[in-house]
Amino acid sequence: MADSDNTPTSRKDFETAIIAKAWKDPEYLRRLRSNPREVLQEELEALHPGAQLPDDLGISIHEEDENHVHLVMPRHPQNVSDQTLTDDDLDQAAGGTGIGVVVAVVAGAVANTGAGVNQVAGGNINVVGNINVNANVSVNMNQTT
C-alpha cells in the first residue's frame, strides 16, 4: 500500500507506479525497454537517495501480450542463504520502513532492512542497505512494521 503521499511501500505499489508511468509516457516506456537498469536505478534513488543497484544485477523487462502471460515463480526458500546486517545497516533502517527491491526474473525470497524481517515464500534473507536483491529481475517491494 502506498503511504499518504503516494510513495510506494510495497512491491505491488512500486510495480504499479512504474507500469502506470510507462502506460502514460511513451518515452518512459521506451527508456524502460531499452535500459531498464537505468530507469529502475532512477526510481530507486527517488525513493532512497544514494541507494545503488548491485553492478552484477541483471534486469529484464517482460511484456505480456494477448497470447502470453508471465508468471513469476519465486526462488525456492531452500535455495536462499541468510545474510546478517551490520550495525551500520541497522542504523540506516532505524526509520522502520524500507522498500526492498528484489530484481528477479525467477524472483527470490526477500526481507526488508527495517525494524524486522519479512518472509516471502518462507525464506528469510537480510541484505545490506535499503534494497534487497536476488539477482535477475522483476521488482519486489516489502514494508517493515
UniProtKB/Swiss-Prot annotation:
D-alanine (Ala): residues bearing it: A104
Residue(s) carrying N4-methyl-D-asparagine: N112, N118, N124, N130, N132, N136
Annotated positions of the 3-hydroxyvaline (Thr) modification: T113
Record-listed 3,3-dimethylmethionine modification sites: M141
SUPFAM superfamilies: Nitrile hydratase alpha chain
Example GO molecular function: catalytic activity
Modified residues (D-serine (Ser)): S138
List of residues that carry D-threonine: T144
Modified residues (3-methylvaline): V101, V103, V105, V117, V127
InterPro entries xrefs: CN_Hdrase_a/SCN_Hdrase_g_sf, TOMM_pelo
3-methyl-D-valine: residues carrying this PTM: V102, V106, V110
D-asparagine sites (modified residues): N140, N142
Proregion residues excised on maturation: 1-96
Domain of life: Bacteria
Modification(s) after translation: Epimerization of most, and perhaps all, L- to D-amino acids is catalyzed by PoyD, when PoyA and PoyD are coexpressed in E.coli. N-methylations are catalyzed by PoyE, when PoyA and PoyE are coexpressed in E.coli.
(3R)-N4-methyl-3-hydroxy-D-asparagine modification, residue list: N126, N134
Residue(s) carrying 3-hydroxy-D-valine: V120, V128
Residues annotated with 2-oxo-5,5-dimethylhexanoate modification: T97
Positions where (3S)-3-methylglutamine occurs in the chain: Q119
Keywords from the UniProt entry: Antibiotic, Antimicrobial, D-amino acid, Hydroxylation, Methylation
Other known facts: The name 'proteusin' is inspired by Proteus, a Greek shape-shifting sea god.
Cross-referenced NCBIfam families: leader_NHLP (TIGR03793)
The protein's role, per its UniProt record: Antimicrobial peptide active against Gram-positive bacteria (MIC=4->125 ug/ml). May act by forming transmembrane ion channels, since the peptide rapidly depolarizes the bacterial cytoplasmic membrane, simultaneously decreasing the membrane potential and intracellular potassium contents.
Name of the protein described by the UniProt record: Polytheonamide B
